[in-house]
Swiss-Prot record:
Record's description of how this protein is used: Non-allergenic peptides identified from the mapped major conformational IgE epitope-containing areas could be used for the engineering of house dust mite allergy vaccine.
GO aspect biological process, one term: protein complex oligomerization
Gene coding for it: DERP5
Native organism taxonomy: Eukaryota, Metazoa, Ecdysozoa, Arthropoda, Chelicerata
InterPro entries for this protein: Mite_allergen_group-5/21, Mite_allergen_group-5/21_sf
Listed name of the protein: Mite allergen Der p 5
Assembly information from the UniProt record: Monomer. Trimer of homodimers. Oligomerizes in a concentration-dependent manner.
């Protein structure tokens, strides 16, 4: 009788674990939705950067004071947003329940933001050097 109960419990455990398809590798839905939102914002940021690059190229051809002020203001806004995201990522990285996959995603998002901020500051310095 004990053998039958043990076999039944083991079979039930295997069925509940293996029969479920995971749509993502996150421990809970909140983490999945948060990272999905971060990735959406990164895509929007990339499009904004392409637009900003077009503005910089146009500014180099025909520099005006208004264009320079607009570009510098947009760069300052993007850098401030990156700083805000860095704070959120730092708080998330302090959690003790993250697995390796989640830690890797957070670290990569933070490093990407650092690289982007560094490049934006270089571009901003280059734009500020152009005489109007």
């Amino acid at each position: 009788m004990k053998f039958i109960i043990a076999f039944f419990v083991a079979t039930l455990a295997v069925m509940t674990v293996s029969g479920e398809d995971k749509k993502h590798d996150y421990q809970n839905e909140f983490d999945f939705l948060l990272m999905e939102r971060i990735h959406e914002q990164i895509k929007k940021g990339e499009l904004a950067l392409f637009y900003l690059q077009e503005q910089i190229n146009h500014f180099e051809e025909k520099p005006t004071k208004e264009m320079k002020d607009k570009i510098v203001a947009e760069m300052d806004t993007i850098i401030a947003m990156i700083d805000g995201v860095r704070g959120v990522l730092d708080r998330l990285m302090q959690r003790k329940d993250l697995d390796i996959f989640e830690q890797y995603n957070l670290e990569m998002a933070k490093k990407s933001g650092d690289i982007l901020e560094r490049d934006l500051k270089k571009e901003e310095a280059r734009v500020k050097k152009i005489e109007v």
